[in-house]
Amino acid sequence: MNRRDFLGILALGALLNFESFNDLAFAQVNGSLQGSELFANKEFSYQALRALSKTYSSCADIKECFLAIKSIKDGDTNSWFEGWKAQGDRLYSLAEEYYSEGFLVSARESYLRASNYLRTSGFFLGANPKDPRIFDTYAKSRSSFVKAASLFDPKIESVEIQYQDTTIPLYFVKASNDQTPRPTIVMVGGFDSNAEELVMDWGFGAIKRGFNFVAFDGPGQGRALILQGLYFRPDFEKVSKPIINYIVTRKDVNLKKIAMFGVDLGGYFAPRACAFDSRIALLVADGGVFDYYSSLTSLLPPVAKNLLETDKAAFNKAMAEALKDNITFRWAVHHGMWAFNAPTIADFFLKTKPYNLKNIISNINCPTLVVNSTNTFFFKGESKKFYDLLECPREMINMTASEGAEEGSQVGALGFAQGVIFNWLEYHLNKIVG
């Protein structure tokens, strides 16, 4: 590689300072924050909105979120950790107090908010998985959720599913206290989600509509990654089959009405599961991911992509320099290195190559809904590509700014998103006889 090429790859640092990076395209005019922007830093804004959006399911409160936001120095990840952790710790202590006094509804709601804020506090720690705060904060966030789960009626069940020589955690949220066989939604998270958050964002909305709801941490996600050291794997059917095997043993599940719902990178995992399991009757991909490597490397200038394939050492050096001043991409790459068990930046990129549906998409036979958030960034264009190549009955819905639902995973517009997606599921599940 000559000096000119190396200078070109170093320019990647400038290219990574996207004004609309990671699902946000808020305007900043004359130094004032406009629209929904909560921080000048785009990733801080998106993650704060992610926490705040859980007010829809009573897993956040507006002023508590604003107290955290107000205490945070924009762009300072340590300040972010302290600001959200303070709220999480306060709510956890309050929940413990309520519980000891027998105020169980108040305890449950406070545990849920504590879990959300503690998860949020640890978000940027994923850029350094050796930071011990990751493990302590996640463990407390999960513990808070599990305590809340025990206070529902019916209780949210915590189940351990046998996986290889260990187990993976699953939550089963029943629609009712009886044993009536009901339609069941199995939700698969993405690159940085955990099962607790899936229940908060989607599970409570599902049971209102008479669906059972299942969420789990697969390898590379939540507890499986943070506390067990299990990493992402492309052959996700090896993960999903034990989950479905468990679900079909339950008397409260209608075996003909099992739907798989994947969000973010789950838009690859869920279709993969459906391609290998005919027991799944419906698929929702929010949004679809046809080829992870192609999508990820499309963010790179041509010289960088070429370098990735030909000179890993030079690519690593240039990328490390480029990431210094970009919080979002630095977090994404370093978290990816951790979740994919990749020793270097180049290895992370290259390890995404097998994550594609090229040879199996024709095996997806169930009716499929593809959800495309129009302001997504990492998987831009993937939903349309996935939709176009499907051979099964399919529909695609665009989530747009006019509905407030344009962000990835419809953060900030969960009520609207639930209406659209759950209505589609309800309509198609009702058409299935049995």
Question: Model-derived features: where do they sit?
Answer:
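Alpha/beta-hydrolase active-site loop
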Residues: 231-251
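N-terminal export signals
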Residues: 5-26
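Catalytic histidine-centered segment of alpha/beta-hydrolase-like enzymes
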Residues: 402-415
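Catalytic histidine neighborhood in serine/cysteine hydrolases
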Residues: 390-405
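Short beta-strand/loop motif that positions the catalytic acidic residue
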Residues: 364, 370-372
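Conserved alpha/beta-hydrolase "acid-adjacent" motif
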Residues: 377-382
